[in-house]
């Protein structure tokens, strides 16, 4: 007898003790989600891409300077000519374009007196009709900046939705954990009921039907316990995904009793919702985009008329210094114009822009009404959840008292176990209903904050 005991003790010593699962609070999960949520990381990458693209577009309005070197050899005389210099241009945001070029040419071995020559050209172009509106020239820069702003709002929207997602998943897991605890208690009571019913059946005070009823109740409780356990693991996986946690990380949670912000009054929440919801602000800016599109389309319908101011000079000499000195400068001014005979494409572009503007304005009005309706719907659900919780709490107390009375009567032999099973099922349903309504209040308050645009991220991240 001693050897098996020693062997069992040795096995217990050799088995490593698993460390306790860490407890992740809602604040810790939210902070992890803000840093590692895959969907949020994707939109952050899109924001960085938009910022880089904006820098690229802005660089097109900076001076563009390109040095060059070229060599050419004549086929007839086999004489080589070297040319080097630079070209420069700059497009100003108000539409003016400046182009310049400076070239120095050298003919090695040329017997002429001046083997070096230079050429200078500076051209200033100003649109006078088509494209004279500065909005035409600045449109690429404006669109790039709008893309950055739009992506910033997308990030803010997804951050708020991530808070909602984490809370829904976290509270869902907390609900299933509590349901699992209730199912375990119910299973334990059902097991005791089955044992007591069998004992009374053997004593002859109960029928076989009572034993079968108790066994069925025990099986039902075990099924509920199994379902709750599986739901806990499913929601644990969802929480891992939402927070960017490791797929095998084991953890426990602590259900929050409150949320860090208080929802405003319904009237206050509906007032000014368009100024607080990023979706509404973005829709308003899309109207501005369409207005710019119409403005540009009208400008492009005008005939092309450009004023051109040109400065030219040349130089020559026996050395580089002499050749670089400009001689015979000329200054000329002229007009350049063109207009296509088929203006249908430009007309169609203007009409498309005008129709798109009407659509954006109509959609914004619908969005305004939808956001107000969303606020009202969220507050109705909060009122309903609060009312349901009051009823569910009272119902749970009555159901508990009924179950206790039925159990007491059964233990004293005053009744069979039918009333016990019935009262037990009612009590279990009442407790789950009270649990659901309690969690529904927290989720409804979050929906009120989100719908009113008052869901601020920092207070949620500062939770312990």
Q: Can you describe what each PLM-predicted range is?
A:
Residues 9-79, 83, 124-139, 143-145, ...:
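Bacterial Sec-pathway N-terminal export signals of envelope proteins
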Residues 11-18, 247, 259-267, 313, ...:
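Acidic, low-complexity, intrinsically disordered peripheral segments
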Residues 17-21, 68-126, 252-263, 295, ...:
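Small/polar, glycine/serine/threonine/aspartate-rich low-complexity segments that form flexible
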Residues 41-45, 49, 58-59, 93-117, ...:
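Sec/SRP-type N-terminal targeting helices
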Residues 201-205, 410-414, 451:
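A short glycine-centered flexible hinge/capping loop motif at secondary-structure junctions
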């Amino acid at each position: 007898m001693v050897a098996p005991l020693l062997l069992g003790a040795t096995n217990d010593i050799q088995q490593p003790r698993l460390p306790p699962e860490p407890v992740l609070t809602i604040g810790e999960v939210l902070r992890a989600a803000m840093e590692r949520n895959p969907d949020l990381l994707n939109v952050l990458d899109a924001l960085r891409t938009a910022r880089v693209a904006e820098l690229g577009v802005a660089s097109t309005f900076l001076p563009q300077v390109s040095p060059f070197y070229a060599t050419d050899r004549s086929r007839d005389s086999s004489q080589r000519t070297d040319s080097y210099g630079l070209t420069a241009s700059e497009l100003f945001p108000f539409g003016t374009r400046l182009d310049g070029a400076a070239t120095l040419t050298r003919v090695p071995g040329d017997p002429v007196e001046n083997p070096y020559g230079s050429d200078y050209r500076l051209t200033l172009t100003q649109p006078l009709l088509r494209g004279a509106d500065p909005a035409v020239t600045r449109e690429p820069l404006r669109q790039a900046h709008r893309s950055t702003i739009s992506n910033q709002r997308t990030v803010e929207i997804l951050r708020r939705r991530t808070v909602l997602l984490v809370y829904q998943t976290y509270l869902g897991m907390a609900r299933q954990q509590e349901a699992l605890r209730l199912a375990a208690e119910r299973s334990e009571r059902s097991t005791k009921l089955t044992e007591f019913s069998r004992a009374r059946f053997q004593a002859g005070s109960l029928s076989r039907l009572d034993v079968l009823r108790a066994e069925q109740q025990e099986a039902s409780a075990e099924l509920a316990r199994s379902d709750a356990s599986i739901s806990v693991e499913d929601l644990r996986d969802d929480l891992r995904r939402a927070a960017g946690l490791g797929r095998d990380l084991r953890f426990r949670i602590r259900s929050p009793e409150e949320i860090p912000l208080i929802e405003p009054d319904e009237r206050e929440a509906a007032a000014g919702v368009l100024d607080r919801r990023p979706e509404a602000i973005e829709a308003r800016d899309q109207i501005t985009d369409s207005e710019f599109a119409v403005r540009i389309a009208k400008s492009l319908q005008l005939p092309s008329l450009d004023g051109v101011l040109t400065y030219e000079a040349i130089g020559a000499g026996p050395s580089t210094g002499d050749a670089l000195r400009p001689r015979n400068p000329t200054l000329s001014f002229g007009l350049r114009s063109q207009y296509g005979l088929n203006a249908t494409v430009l007309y169609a572009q203007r009409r498309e822009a005008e129709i798109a503007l009407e659509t954006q304005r109509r959609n914004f009005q619908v969005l305004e009404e939808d956001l107000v309706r969303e606020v009202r719907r969220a507050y109705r659900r909060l009122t309903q959840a609060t009312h349901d919780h009051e009823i569910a709490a009272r119902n749970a107390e009555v159901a508990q008292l009924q179950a206790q009375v039925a159990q007491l009567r059964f233990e004293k032999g005053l009744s069979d176990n039918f009333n016990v099973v019935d009262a037990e099922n009612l009590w279990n349903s009442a407790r789950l209903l009270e649990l659901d309504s309690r969690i529904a209040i927290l989720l409804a308050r979050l929906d009120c904050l989100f719908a009113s645009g008052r869901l601020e991220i920092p207070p949620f991240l500062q939770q312990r």
